[in-house]
Amino acid sequence: MTPDGLYCDPAELDWSQPSGPRARAYGDVYFSAEDGLEEARAVFLRGCGLPEAWTGRRHYVVGELGFGTGLNALALWQLWRQTRPTDGWLDFVTVEKHPLDRDAAARAFAAWPELSDLASRLLTQWPSRLRGPQRLVFPEDGFAITIFQDEVEAALSQMTRPVDAWFLDGFAPDRNAAMWSQAVFNRLGELSVPGTRVGTFTVAGFVRRGLAEAGFDVAKRPGFGRKRERLEAVWPGEAVDGSLANVDGPVAVLGAGIAGASLVHALRRRGIETVLIDAHGVASGASGAPAGLLTPRLEKADRPHVRATLAAFDFARRLYDGRPGFHAEPVRRLPKDEREAERFAILADWMPDHLDWTGEALVMPGAGRFEPARLVADLVADAQCHRARIGRVEPLGSGIGLYDDAGECRFEVAHLVIAAGAGARRFYPDLQPSAGQLAVFDGAPPDMPTAWGNYACAAPGGVLVGATHDRGDQVGPEDVAEAGFRASVAERMPGLALGPVQGRWQGVRAATPDRLPVAGRLSERVSILAGLGSRGFAHAPLLAEDLASELMGGVPALAQTGREAMAPGRFAERRSRRAGQGAAG
């Protein structure tokens, strides 16, 4: 990967025709000039046997090539709302190489007033142009959209969840050959199950032959409007219920900081019973600081973990927007020297959807300031937190038992997720503790939250300055930390007056050797979400969303390479490789 590939090129639209937008790159329309919505219903919804195919299903997955304006997503969403099975969940996973911006999508949606409510909700979460999967969740309707923004083959290679129906809605095959290649058809087959249906406008001969060669049974059907024919296809075999839930029963979440709260929130909105456990209560550890800044991770690279962490920042921003304790406002980052200023300018060029370089500071317009305890409490507002210390976990029957220090089994669950911050080291030794302090001073906060190595922002009671980073779990002297804060502010923000200290906070973070989180399975019945360091509020929600999806057998929220970058087993694998190389030498 190269930095030039971090974002997709935007769609270039021609609005000169009254029928709607055309893609300049392909010289083709996004939808029918006659009635694009009814065409979507006929070709894709009815063409894939919907809604009958999801009747009685707990979980259903629809895949699409060619998200375009999002019209098919809205048509599918509307039908799902009207016919959703009890407690059903619909995953819509779609691919788009050239994303539309929010304003263009809104202009296109204006043609269908009957979809205005759904269109407004979709536009509220409209993603950036970042490559890779972007997860949008609408829990009140049991509906999630995962938009893979990339080349079709690259996107399909990162998908792992089988699909129950495919919408092939790319531009005309002769104008967009990359979307209609044999490699694409073969991958569609690999991601299908017996009974998977395919709907598409085209009847091009090489498309019929390509789908058939991939293993589909293909047939022509009457077309829509003036189009005489269209194609339907099915993966052979008796249709199966593709609901692949990996956990049958309650899930215990150990830890009630931002990691645990994000997990409980993601699981409960999917209807999964949860048991939240923390010996000290909600937001009692590192997630209980007076204030914090939500900013994207700054890294001059285009690698799987960079895409994943940027997608996580975007997801967290959407999740927190409008919640108690979150304040959407730009954050600026001051460079420490000329070399870092040059780096920031380059980063702003590479990440235009996330960063602006003013010549003096790096501004993150989509960032924010938050009150951690309020945010965490809001995410678990409908969940009870059990105050118990768990000393050991053991298999118990078909599930797992959680025992306290006295040896009593306190909880029996189907699955356990360890999200206990620094306390997770008991279960995952590769975590590294880092103690830290913050102080709240009397005085007016800066005009904009500002970071430079330390940071300063508004907090209840005055202006917060943080944070120290001390190796290990021992917090340094308070007077030394305070003197350091005052000296740092005097040097970098001389106009910020700090009065007497009004409050202090200290805690212990948990990080990993490569400074990336760990998220995934430790064993069949135990998973982990930890090692978030000082970026828990930016990264935890999407990692929790991905883990919740995995437990219910849904579509992952991360690309496969992104999941591998966060995999809990990576450090053991690296040690094994080094040992093997040493033995070979």
Curated annotation (Swiss-Prot):
Residues 254-585 are annotated as: FAD-dependent cmnm(5)s(2)U34 oxidoreductase. It catalyses: 5-aminomethyl-2-thiouridine(34) in tRNA + S-adenosyl-L-methionine = 5-methylaminomethyl-2-thiouridine(34) in tRNA + S-adenosyl-L-homocysteine + H(+). Its EC number is 2.1.1.61, 1.5.-.-. Residues 564-585 are annotated as: Disordered. Its cofactor is FAD. Residues 1-236 are annotated as: tRNA (mnm(5)s(2)U34)-methyltransferase. Pfam families: DAO (PF01266), Methyltransf_30 (PF05430). GO terms for molecular function: flavin adenine dinucleotide binding; oxidoreductase activity, acting on the CH-NH group of donors; tRNA (5-methylaminomethyl-2-thiouridylate)(34)-methyltransferase activity. GO terms for biological process: methylation; tRNA wobble base modification. One of its GO terms (cellular component) is cytoplasm. It is found in: Cytoplasm. It comes from the Bacteria. Its main location: cytoplasm. Keywords: Cytoplasm, FAD, Flavoprotein, Methyltransferase, Multifunctional enzyme, Oxidoreductase, S-adenosyl-L-methionine, Transferase, tRNA processing. In the N-terminal section; belongs to the methyltransferase superfamily. tRNA (mnm(5)s(2)U34)-methyltransferase family. Catalyzes the last two steps in the biosynthesis of 5-methylaminomethyl-2-thiouridine (mnm(5)s(2)U) at the wobble position (U34) in tRNA. Catalyzes the FAD-dependent demodification of cmnm(5)s(2)U34 to nm(5)s(2)U34, followed by the transfer of a methyl group from S-adenosyl-L-methionine to nm(5)s(2)U34, to form mnm(5)s(2)U34. This is tRNA 5-methylaminomethyl-2-thiouridine biosynthesis bifunctional protein MnmC. The lineage of its organism: Bacteria, Pseudomonadati, Pseudomonadota, Alphaproteobacteria, Maricaulales. The gene is mnmC.
